[in-house]
Amino acid sequence: MRLYDLTAHRLRELLLGREVSAAELCRSVLNRIDEVEGRVKAYVTLDREGALRQAAAVDRELQNGRELPPLAGIPFAIKDNICLRGLPATCSSKILHNWVPPYDATVVEKLKDQQTVILGKTNMDEFAMGSSTEHSAFFTTRNPWDPKRVPGGSSGGSAAAVAAGSAICALGSDTGGSIRQPASFCGVVGMKPTYGLVSRYGLVAFASSLDQIGPLTRDVTDCALVMNAICGHDHRDSTSVPKEVPDFTSFLVDDVKGMRIGLPREYFPAELDDGVRRIVMEAVSVFEERGAYVEETSLPHTEYALPVYYLIAPAEASSNLARYDGVRYGYRAPECEDVLDMFRVSRSRGFGAEVKRRIMLGTYALSAGYYDAYYLKALKVRTLIRRDFEEAFEKFDVLLSPTAPETAFIIGAKTEDPIRMYLSDIFTLAVNLAGLPGMSVPAGFVAGLPVGIQFIGKPFAEGTLLRMGYAFQQSTDHHRQRPPETPGGEIS
C-alpha cells in the first residue's frame, strides 16, 4: 500500500485503526520526496527532523488513547510566503533568502492545533507574481504529469507536491488564480475561499485586497477537512470576517438535483482549447444527468477583468514591497556608496524581473497625473465586475467554467511574452476582484494532461462549491488518477 497516494480522510481511518502509525506515514512521504524531488522540485525547504518529531508526538497521543483532531498525523506542505516559525520564508526571492520568521501565521497555528505533520515550504513564483513557478529566484518546479511542463503558479510547488505524493495536503495562496490554476494543471483540488474567511496574518502580502490562503488536496472531502481547520475570525487580521464557520463536511452530499448552474458565455470564448471545452461540457452533462438545471448566462464586464487586475494588483504590490529596502531584513547589497545607493542596489539585485515589472507598473498607476485615469477607474470597473456576479447569483446557485484556458504548457513557452502568461489566469482573476469563493476540481485529461473545472459561488457559499465538487467526484474518477511513474533523477 502506497501511503503517500492516499487521501487524508482514508489515512485517518488507518491511523485510528492502528493499521499504520503517523511515523510510518511520515517516512512514506519523506521517502517519496527522495524519489521524485529531483525531477519535480516542489520544495524550497524541507524539515525532516521536525516532521518526524511531530509524527512521533501523534503516535504517543494514539498510544495513550486520546481523541485526535481530524487532520492529526497528516503530512502537509506550506507555500513559502506563509510564515512558519523557525523555517525560512523566502517567497522564492533573493531579497528574502535569509529571513526566518519568529512567529507562525494563523493558518499554521491552526494546523499545529490539528497536530498535522508539517514537512516544509514549497516553491512559488517570486512574491506570488506569476502563473508557472518559473519566476522563482531558485529553480523552476516541474509538473509531475510531464516534467517538461509547468505546474502552474504561483502555488506551483504546493500543487506539484500533492500531485506527486510528496505531501498529502498543502496550503497555497490565491491572488488571481494562484491556487486554482495550478490545481487544474496538476490534477488536484484547489479552493480559493471568500475574501476574509481565512486569516491573512502571517501571509507575506502581494495585493492585500485580493490575497487569500486556501487548500490544495487530493479530493473534495480532504478540501472540506482543511477548510474546517483553517477558517475562522482572527483579530490580528483587520480583513478577517467575524462570521461563524460551518462544518464544511456537512455539505458533502451526493445530490445536485434542482441546483441551478450558470455557464458564463465569456468564459467559453472561441479561443478556448478544444480539448478543454470538451472536458468542461462533459462535466456539464454529468450535472444535467443528475437533475441540475443548466443555462448560459453573461458576465458582461469580464473583458475588463484582466486590465483591471493588472492595475490594482501591481499598485498594491508596489506599496507592499516598498518595505524591502535592505535595512531591516533580507538581502543587502554590499559596498554601496550611501544609504540611497544601498536602497537602489539592494532592490535592483534582490527582486527578479517579473517583480520589478509589476512594481514599476503599479508605481506608474499610482503616480500623480495617472491615478485618476488608471487606478481610480480600475476600482470603479471592479465594482461593475462584482455587480455582474451579484446579478448572476440572483438566478443561479453556482457558476461553472474552465479553470484555465489550456492544459499545462511547456517550460519556457511564455517567459518572453508577459501578456500570454497573464492570460493563463483569465478565468480566475475576476473571482478575486469580486472577493468570491472559487474551487477547481479535476474533470478529465487532454493528451495525458489534467483539466480542471471551476465552480464559483456567492460570498461565503463554500459549502455549495464543496457539494458540487463532491457530487461530481461520486460520478467520476478523475481525482483518483495519479501521475505516471518515471525515473526520479535530476533533469537539467
Swiss-Prot record:
E.C. no: 6.3.5.7
Superkingdom classification of source: Bacteria
Annotated Pfam families: Amidase
InterPro entries the UniProt entry points to: Amidase, Amidase_CS, Amidase_dom, AS_sf, GatA
Catalyzed chemical reaction(s): L-glutamyl-tRNA(Gln) + L-glutamine + ATP + H2O = L-glutaminyl-tRNA(Gln) + L-glutamate + ADP + phosphate + H(+)
Assigned GO CC terms: glutamyl-tRNA(Gln) amidotransferase complex
Residue ranges crossing the lipid bilayer per the database entry: none
Listed PROSITE patterns: AMIDASES
Catalytic residues (UniProt): K79 (charge relay system), S154 (charge relay system), S178 (acyl-ester intermediate)
Gene Ontology MF: a single term: ATP binding
Job description of the protein: Allows the formation of correctly charged Gln-tRNA(Gln) through the transamidation of misacylated Glu-tRNA(Gln) in organisms which lack glutaminyl-tRNA synthetase. The reaction takes place in the presence of glutamine and ATP through an activated gamma-phospho-Glu-tRNA(Gln).
Oligomer status and interactors: Heterotrimer of A, B and C subunits.
Record-given protein name: Glutamyl-tRNA(Gln) amidotransferase subunit A
UniProt organism field: Desulforudis audaxviator (strain MP104C)
